[in-house]
Amino acid sequence: MKIFRPLSLRFLPVFLCAVSIGCLAQAVSSPSPQHLFFRVTLGAQQATPVSGRLILMIKPGTKLEDVQVGEFHPARISIAAKDVSGWKPGESVDIHTDNIAFPAGFSKLPQGDYVVQAVLDTANKFSYYGRLPGDIESDPTFLAHWTAGQGDEPKLTLVKTIEPKTRDWLSPKMTAAEKQGATDSTKMFDFVSPSLTQFWGRSMHIRAWVLLPPGYSDHPKERYPTVYFTHGFGGKMEYNKFTAAMLYQRMAEGKMPPMIWVLLDESSPRGTDEFADSVNNGPWGQALTQEAIPALERQYRMDAKPSGRFLNGHSSGGWATLWLQVTYPKIFGGTWSTSPDPSDFHDFTGIDLYAAHANVFRGPDGTPYPIIRDKGKVMATFKELTQLEDVLGHYGGQVRSFDWVFSPRGSDGRPEPMFNHYTGDVDPAVVAYWQQHYDIAYRVAQQWPTIGHDLRGKVHLYVGTADTFYLDGAAHKLDAVFQGLHANEQFTYIPDRTHFDLYRIKKDRVGLLDEIAVRMYAVARPKAHWKATQTVAPAR
């Protein structure tokens, strides 16, 4: 699930099973397929043949602007897709818009005005990142008074390759001194992991931005507590640099105590790796704790002990940091995880995966399961999100990302899907594997006799009671497990807060982060009694 920016399932954060093209078509096709085609031509400006997933998007209206896909109100835009290989400049491809389509075939669209656009996803990353540099797109095209199946076949041409955009990661609200300080204090960390490289058979990197606190170079003998942060679903290395600037400014202004922040990138074409050891993604937890962290502690003046190593993340990043703390309780001194993805699979965004005849699309009474809400209103169902992701591609969507982390590997080398993408029926064998390996509440209960001594008092979880992705339910269940063990863990439920405004205190949209940082520092420096020079608002 995602952090701070409402974009893709977090979006959720927060979230990858493999389904054949035939299965995708079955999942989203009309019962009696029509034969409505759109023709897309690869423009002559393209010098070489290209391959990828050709995505066609159409929406009602007359405004000529890019047609964007989103998890909120997903059915407002219709999408069709087709894989292409070795597509040569000047050649045309026909997309059968009732074959692989969402929410239904284009032949079902009513007569009206529409804007249509085509995008070639050249790197198979659209489901996670959206449009990327290197993708090729058409201009938005207006279809006036269009009636499906009547008149000439609509035609589009891919004429523009998306170019990289340079964005200033330094806030315009920063002073000149703060901008210079943030620039000098933000360091790239690019570490080749031996264990991940061995798993994948190619060079695999753990990447992060390391933010040094103001005054780091002026105090060469000083060591600092270190926070390991990771983003939510949809995040990436670029966004972490914006976070670094924000953190530096808050430390420089005296809102936060001086600490080193390691802003870890957990994104991949498959979704988020969660820094969990997985038979599909590889040993990310092992690589971080046994390889990357020792390398960082050799390079920077970190406390390099459990009482000075902390974790923070939101959404999918919240699950990752919660997982790391529970799995490696002797390494980390505490996690402050916010709105984590489901930590108890009895409540997987409101669905009990362990129930008899469990189905993620509908409840026992046939009511569709929601997955996104806003102000009490359902914005999307689990079925809609699944079918949308299936059309966009085989990799990287929130739903499939869970499979890549949690599932056993199938005979085809891909993760086994937790549920049937056509019917929604849950596979009990796969869920049993999920439980044994990744249900945090289950693992805590089972392993408490061995991990309790090192874990007690180290879990701090925050979630809104109106979480956009229904993640408060699983938090309550994990809380109940800890209470049953008489553990001293802190769970904070912030009334009426959603996934996206959880950190807001009064007018400060990330004020909660100051509070978290102060509490971390108190663990690392219990005698320091650090106080903000600007008031840190109390928890609500």
Predicted regions and their residues:
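N-terminal secretory signal peptides that target proteins for export/translocation
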Residues: 1-9
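Non-catalytic cap/lid and distal C-terminal segments of serine-dependent acyl enzymes
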Residues: 59-540
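Bacterial N-terminal signal peptides
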Residues: 10-23
